[in-house]
Amino acid sequence: MCIRDRAKPVAVLGHSQGVLAVHMTRAIEAAGSIEAAGKTLDEILAVAALIGAAGTRRVRELGLNPKYGEASPMLSVKGATREQVEALVKRVNNARGPISIAVTNSDNHHVLSGYPEDLAALALEAEREHKHQAKLREQKLHGGTVFNPTLEYLEVTLPFHSPLMAEAVEQTVSWAGACGFDQDRTRALAEEVLLNHVDWNARVKALFNAADPAKLWIVDLGPGNTLGKLIGNVVQGTGIGVVEATTLSERSTLSTLESE
């Protein structure tokens, strides 16, 4: 995702694994061209493969089944504050492992990582809380909006951005060293993808201070239109424009407009 003030990009943001593209963009900028950055780009792509392999290996070591009924290792919770999500996490008894807030997409949209069975237990707690508040509302003992978040399991096989993946980071760095790759860059990439919490909400809002929001345009490069929707929710009402460039057709149209 490229953020532009007129013709000059002021920032490049990547959501979750999109950080790989951010590092590739920086490498191209530092080298002066795609051709000059070729070796670094190849290494980043190779590290991406190592990250995936290390994550898969760690999941097997943990005995983490990527499916538990409908549950997966990551659960989107939309329509709940961080405090409400943390309260639900505390209600899960006898969890197999940590349930962590992996991604903060907005003030009321969070994604959790953990064992699928633990996330399924949290989903049950959310349903119990909804029914409890609905009953209180029906009895006129509770005012305001009834707690009713939208829950959706992500189609993933790893609990990304989770402390469960700490050993996978070390494994990735070890393999990268054996391959002769830059271990510092490898660690940074692996931690961003596997371990660190992603505060997308804060990253996007930081742009508001980078330039006049009314002059900023965000170009969504995909893949798909999910990211455009996520960022649209954060920048709504700020004056920042969002342009979709997720397909060849959309990019071709933008190139034509720019040349005109």
Give the role of each language-model region.
Residues K8-A11, L154:
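A generic hydrophobic-helix recognition signal that picks specific residues
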Residues V10-G18, V22:
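Gly/Ala-rich beta-loop-alpha elbow adjacent to hydrolase catalytic centers
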Residues H15-Q17, Y115, L221-P223:
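Glycine-rich beta-strand-to-loop/alpha-helix junction loops that act as flexible
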